[in-house]
Amino acid sequence: MAIVKCKPTSPGRRHVVKVVNPELHKGKPFAPLVEKNSKSGGRNNNGRITTRHIGGGHKQAYRIVDFKRNKDGIPAVVERLEYDPNRSANIALVLYKDGERRYILAPKGLKAGDQIQSGVDAAIKAGNTLPMRNIPVGSTVHNVEMKPGKGGQLARSAGTYVQIVARDGSYVTLRLRSGEMRKVESDCRATLGEVGNAEHMLRVLGKAGAARWRGIRPTVRGTAMNPVDHPHGGGEGRNFGKHPVSPWGLQTKGKKTRSNKRTDKFIVRRRTK
């Protein structure tokens, strides 16, 4: 893994910082595990914008990643590591002993030729997936399930991890990167280790066009708009003279938005960031 700072040969190159990994596969992805990925442009089935700042960008194919890791008792060998345009983490193509191939999230330190396994009898080493009742307290894990059998939902981005801090009956307590402490059923599965490609956070796109290649459109400030477009719009000068609100008039900048009371009982401590 190398951090490359581009020479300032043009204004668009001046601030670019790239993360280069020579171990990544340079060819095409494994075709049977690739699907078409249509772009929504941030629109729903009615054609209305439901998510702003999305549109355009390079065409991408979706790699089918195994988040469930439910092929128990069959060892697999890592064939290669690959880039995935749909996520910040890299993925690994693994070959199981019965001949099946699957993509998994590539943990930190995983390389071609390594052996991994899933199931209650799997060894305690990075890349192996076990129910959390079989993982020692204090371990760092990623790709953590929130419901048994649903597939990993927590800690899937590059460089992220969750720590198991306690085990109490049929639940384990997890410490998330945000500082939140949360209870999850101990039958839920998790993969040992942390997600690789932690250097992803060091990259700098360097110019607006690089964001457009990724399908990210500009974010315009409300104060720069007209009154018809935003509650902050219009007026003389830059002061909008009211509490900050969203384009639809709802309070923003710090207002709590969580409303799922059904799962509040599983949160031991609120997040700190």
Curated annotation (Swiss-Prot):
GO terms for molecular function: rRNA binding; structural constituent of ribosome; transferase activity. This is Large ribosomal subunit protein uL2. Residues 28-53, 221-273 are annotated as: Disordered. One of the primary rRNA binding proteins. Required for association of the 30S and 50S subunits to form the 70S ribosome, for tRNA binding and peptide bond formation. It has been suggested to have peptidyltransferase activity; this is somewhat controversial. Makes several contacts with the 16S rRNA in the 70S ribosome. One of its GO terms (biological process) is cytoplasmic translation. The gene is rplB. Keywords: Ribonucleoprotein, Ribosomal protein, RNA-binding, rRNA-binding. Belongs to the universal ribosomal protein uL2 family. Residues 39-48 have a biased composition (Low complexity). It comes from the Bacteria. Part of the 50S ribosomal subunit. Forms a bridge to the 30S subunit in the 70S ribosome. GO terms for cellular component: large ribosomal subunit.
